[in-house]
A protein has these predicted regions:
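N-terminal segment of the mature soluble domain
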Residues: 40, 44-117
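Bacterial N-terminal signal peptides
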Residues: 2-13
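A generic short-segment signal for beta-strand/edge and adjacent turn/coil regions
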Residues: 13, 40-41, 68-74, 124-131, ...
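Short, low-complexity, polar/charged sequence segments that are solvent-exposed and flexible
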Residues: 60-65, 91-93, 121-125, 178-181, ...
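C-terminal/domain-edge helix-coil "capping" segments
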Residues: 20-40, 48-51, 66, 135-204
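Flexible domain-boundary/linker segments
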Residues: 77, 110, 118-121, 176, ...
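Surface-exposed short loop/turn segments
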Residues: 85-161
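Helix-enriched interaction subdomains in cytosolic or periplasmic regions
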Residues: 12-21
């Protein structure tokens, strides 16, 4: 019993840092017409941080390939926003034959305080033969618990998927993400969250 309890405690400690730091808070899917079959989607992350943009678009390309969809990274095919007019962008999208365009952009930032637990020391039951040993154990099962407050930066972003031939909005929503300076991990987790939801909503 002691070994099983210890294994469970270790598992909890190992899994906690892996919990998702990106969550979808709102989403909408077009339902009054069939969802088209996608072959080629242009991914545009409207971000000032080029490293996050590149990591995110690269990961989206990799994940979409699992669904036999070619994800096109905007940082590889489009110049900076301030160097392209809307008419030119439309022409490029039309000529390239994209089925859809997925646009992601941050909307707002806010601070939130999170209570982070340090550790809990467990003392599993030893004896149940008589009342007083059990009574003593019951009050010592949790002998110590510590925590501290951590301030996080929450990035609110929106995502919109448009069909290119008629500019119809097919899929839309908002996310909250705990900002991290580990840009690679941040971008990959965000991409994974979006693709999982795309599949769940039967968009892909």
């Amino acid at each position: 019993m002691c070994l099983a309890f210890l294994a469970f405690t270790i598992l909890c400690v190992m899994v906690t840092p892996l919990l998702a730091r990106t969550k979808i808070v709102h989403r909408w899917v077009l339902t009054d017409q069939p969802m088209p079959k996608f072959r080629k989607i242009l991914i545009i992350a409207v971000l000032e941080n080029y490293l996050i943009r590149q990591e995110f678009e690269d990961e989206m390309e990799r994940l979409l390939a699992r669904s036999n969809i070619e994800g096109i990274r905007s940082h590889m095919v489009l110049p900076p926003r301030n160097e392209m007019m809307e008419r030119e962008l439309k022409q490029r999208i039309k000529e390239a034959g994209y089925d859809a365009v997925l646009v992601i952009r941050p909307k707002a930032f806010r601070k939130e305080t999170e209570e982070v637990g340090t550790k809990t020391i467990y003392m599993p039951p030893i004896a149940y033969q008589s009342f007083w040993p059990y009574w003593d154990m019951a009050f010592k099962q949790f002998s110590a618990k510590g925590s501290y407050l951590k301030e996080n930066t929450i990035v609110s972003a929106e995502f919109n998927l448009y069909r290119t031939n008629d500019e119809t909005l097919l899929w839309s929503g908002e996310t909250d993400t705990v900002y991290s300076e580990n840009f690679g991990k941040l971008a990959k987790e965000y991409a994974s969250t979006l693709v999982k939801q795309l599949r769940k909503d039967k968009v892909l």
